[in-house]
């Protein structure tokens, strides 16, 4: 027994070192990666602007420096908190306001620099560590499982990437963990204040991201299965807490219903179908990126590693269900199943890509980490030295994979997480080298957010002409280089190529240069 206690102390020290490394990864180069489309929208919302106001302003200043767009990344004169909430409610109700309200206060206190804006997400990501420990203690009642889970979370590439995003997903991670731990504690102690605490954490999660509604469904399934489908005191207490949590969220539900057409418009892209090969590949990468991620260019070279990680994950769930008590494995399974199947099944039946959007999968990521943490902690505690050594090596490889991945991504100026803005650093480099550059961009699709993103990277000499998604009556005259930029520019490009004396040369994704045919 003394040897085992000494061994755990050494393991805990190693896990603390890994935790420190994970904290360092979250704060290193937080302003280096491109401030992308979605983050630019975050700044627009907290500034109190709507996208309608952005378009009106850009139309009113044709051929002005693209730096003019930075106006919409600063607080609107006279703007108040209600302007931020209104902007979200009428144009982007898929994003509840809790994170944006907190971020607005944060920026008012500490300034509007990219580093400052992203630092709030980093602080939220730090809170995930004690919440993970709390959840593991309530679920497994094992300090070793908790420390393994914290180590995996600390150097998880996907968690580190989202910790540096000016988006709500680090906060969502915290609220998922806190609500889940609160539920387990309330079921264990069954006191009024613990059930109220669950209601509060659940409503906080709902006000952070709307998919927390699926989390609540998973919790409900878990409670009623554990209570053997009886309306017991705990089941009644859960229903009360669930009702209270959703009652607090009702104002935003009403806002979402009132602006449902805009909600459909902003999430409609998730209905676009992908081939089965691409869909399966994205699922494989999403699961693999929990532990290993060398970037888009390197992913094809390491598909074997992702398949090995998939086998490990499948085995972790087999081991969990085979060896853990029902109340343990059922919680992990419902955490993943209730939040993933409602996204996956429509994709498989009707087509779409809801279930492969990484930011929608944080409950799944956390469930996978819980299962793997349980597997590793059980295996490295085995009495047989040979298997103990093998699994210690596997644990080291998992952590090293995360450290290597985070080391590489920390030095990059873009990553797959930047999605539609992935090429913006390259686009900016081309435009900044050009002679008196003029960008012609259409108003709509993904362009406005990407233009705001580019405004952080471009020199003041770059000018912008915002036009409708329609054929150009005439080509704008420019003594320097003229570029077409953005999605949904086909009508503009077609009208140019049909005019005598002009041609378009593809440069990068979403970027074409206007050339003379002479």
How would you describe each model-predicted region?
Residues 119-140, 178, 318-319:
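Transmembrane-helix motifs of polytopic, lipid-linked glycan transferases
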Residues 202, 243-244, 307-312, 323-348, ...:
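Transmembrane alpha-helix segments characteristic
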């Amino acid at each position: 027994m003394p040897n085992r206690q000494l061994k755990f102390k050494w393991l805990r020290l190693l896990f603390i070192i890994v935790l420190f490394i994970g904290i360092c990864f979250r704060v290193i180069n937080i302003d280096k990666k491109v401030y992308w489309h979605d983050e630019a929208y975050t700044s627009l919302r907290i500034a109190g602007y709507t996208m309608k106001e952005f378009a009106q302003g850009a139309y009113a200043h044709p051929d002005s420096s693209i730096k003019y767009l930075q106006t919409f990344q600063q607080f609107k004169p006279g703007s108040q908190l209600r302007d931020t909430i209104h902007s979200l409610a009428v144009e982007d109700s898929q994003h509840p306001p809790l994170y944006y309200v907190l971020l607005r206060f944060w920026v008012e206190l500490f300034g509007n620099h990219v580093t400052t804006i992203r630092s709030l997400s980093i602080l939220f990501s730090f809170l995930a560590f004690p919440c993970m420990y709390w959840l593991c203690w309530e679920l497994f009642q094992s300090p070793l499982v908790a420390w393994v889970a914290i180590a995996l979370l600390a150097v998880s590439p996907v968690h580190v990437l989202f910790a540096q995003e000016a988006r709500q997903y680090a906060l969502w991670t915290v609220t998922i963990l806190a609500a889940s731990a609160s539920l387990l504690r309330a079921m264990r102690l069954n006191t009024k204040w613990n059930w109220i605490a669950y209601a509060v954490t659940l409503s906080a999660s709902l006000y952070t991201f709307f998919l927390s509604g699926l989390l609540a469904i998973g919790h409900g399934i878990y409670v009623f299965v554990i209570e053997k489908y009886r309306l017991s005191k705990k089941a009644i207490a859960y229903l009360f807490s669930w009702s209270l949590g959703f009652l607090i969220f009702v104002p935003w539900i009403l806002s979402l219903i009132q602006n449902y057409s805009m909600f459909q418009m902003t999430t409609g892209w998730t209905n676009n179908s992908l081939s089965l090969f691409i869909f399966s590949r994205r699922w494989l990468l999403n699961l693999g990126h929990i532990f290993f991620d060398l970037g888009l260019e390197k992913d094809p070279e390491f598909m074997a590693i992702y398949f090995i990680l998939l086998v490990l994950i499948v085995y972790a769930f087999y081991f969990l269900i085979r060896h853990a008590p029902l109340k343990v494995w059922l919680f992990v399974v419902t955490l993943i199943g209730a939040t993933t199947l409602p996204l996956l099944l429509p994709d498989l039946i009707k087509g779409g890509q809801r279930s492969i959007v990484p930011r929608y999968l944080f409950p799944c990521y956390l469930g996978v980490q819980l299962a793997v943490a349980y597997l590793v902690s059980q295996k490295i505690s085995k009495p047989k030295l040979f298997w103990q050594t093998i699994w210690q090596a596997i644990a080291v490889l998992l952590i090293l994979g995360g450290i290597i991945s985070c080391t590489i991504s920390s030095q990059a100026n873009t990553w797959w997480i930047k999605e539609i803005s992935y090429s913006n650093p390259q686009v900016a480099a081309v435009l900044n080298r050009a002679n008196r550059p003029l960008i012609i961009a259409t108003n709509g699709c993904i362009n406005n957010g990407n233009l705001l993103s580019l405004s952080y990277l471009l020199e003041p000499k770059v000018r912008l002409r915002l036009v409708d998604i329609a054929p150009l009556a005439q080509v704008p005259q420019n003594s320097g280089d003229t570029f077409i930029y953005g999605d949904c520019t086909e009508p503009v490009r077609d009208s140019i190529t049909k005019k005598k004396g002009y041609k378009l040369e593809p440069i990068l994704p979403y970027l074409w240069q206007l050339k003379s045919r002479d």
